[in-house]
Amino acid sequence: MSGGGVIRGPAGNNDCRIYVGNLPPDIRTKDIEDVFYKYGAIRDIDLKNRRGGPPFAFVEFEDPRDAEDAVYGRDGYDYDGYRLRVEFPRSGRGAGGRGGGGGGGGGGGGGGGGGGGGGGGGGGGAPRGRYGPPSRRSEYRVVVSGLPPSGSWQDLKDHMREAGDVCYADVFRDGTGVVEFVRKEDMTYAVRKLDNTKFRSHEGETAYIRVKVDGPRSPSYGRSRSRSRSRSRSRSRSNSRSRSYSPRRSRGSPRYSPRHSRSRSRT
């Protein structure tokens, strides 16, 4: 039976749906959301908690690029001593995948229907797709400086979503970055509230960053790509995933709200 509190959206693209196996027996929908929210807007979380078998789940994102990033970033992730198995379901990817980038992601999907048991090789070594929906860009751009060496575009996007809806983020080798917002007021809020704030990278490095509105001749914009992508994601698709739309994380609206979710902090 499905875990309680799942919000059902319209039927989505299979490229947006991922399988999550090897979950702890006491996992809840809200816990799964906490693991995956940073990759993008979540449309649905379907938690299967069958009697006599280990729980597993299907997570559906709004954007297929977010699903690819979740597979790339969370397959093999250690969650309370359980090594998560994250991959595309067998029916979700394959020869018909978009632009030739989808076939690699579907390799290990056999476990999707079986509750996290067998299955093939898993998504950890799968190449990320190189094609996707057109990038969403905006003129409401800020330049960020003072980023720590391990700061990635996703760290920056997560930090700046405190101000509003981010549609693009990237970082450069010199410790600067650019962030584009959907709305002008969010850009203004970011400059006012996030300038000289403490930034933390995914590796735990911290630094106080400066945020200012990007001018037409900004020295940062258009430089070489992200440190993290160029160094460790050499097989990433040519169009940066960082360009996908991400909804605001604070200032009122929740990330994702299952009807009966029961929050539980994990340390």
UniProtKB/Swiss-Prot annotation:
Key word Repeat present: yes
GO cellular component terms, A-Z: cytoplasm; nuclear speck
Lineage: superkingdom: Eukaryota
Subcellular location: Cytoplasm; Nucleus speckle
Region (Disordered): 90-137, 212-267
Gene Ontology process terms (BP): mRNA processing; RNA splicing
Biased amino acid composition, Basic residues: 224-267
Keyword RNA-binding: yes
Function summary: May play a role in preventing exon skipping, ensuring the accuracy of splicing and regulating alternative splicing.
Protein name: Serine/arginine-rich splicing factor 1
Gene coding for it: srsf1
